[in-house]
């Protein structure tokens, strides 16, 4: 499956389709979900359409910092709540403490979204063989949203990223 949300509609998640041509300063979120032999994976990247500014630019920077913070501690024995807190700390540093997401990742397998959630109150520890997403995101109806999502396999010593799309700041220019 592939779909794309843009501008303020990103904040509402899976939205009804419409014809819209992005304008300079918009953010666009293409989402690719795959299913192979009964197992799911997802890969999402926010793309800056032209030059973004204000909350969109600040949120983009905070999401990239949150993503990096999650990946730094991604290994067996790390609690899901620790992953959440690592991302939340970066969101707060970026000035987004008032719109923290409920989760910054989730399990994935026979369904696209499964337990366990990478959430503040989940003390479950990562174990080898788990497949989860790392998907820090910030959403607000007034300016849209920014999210990067990768599917990862937890290994004995760390993780393997199963989705290989480029990371960092992405722009159509």
Predicted segments with their positions:
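Active-site neighborhoods and metal-handling regions in enzymes and metal-associated proteins
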Residues: 1-173
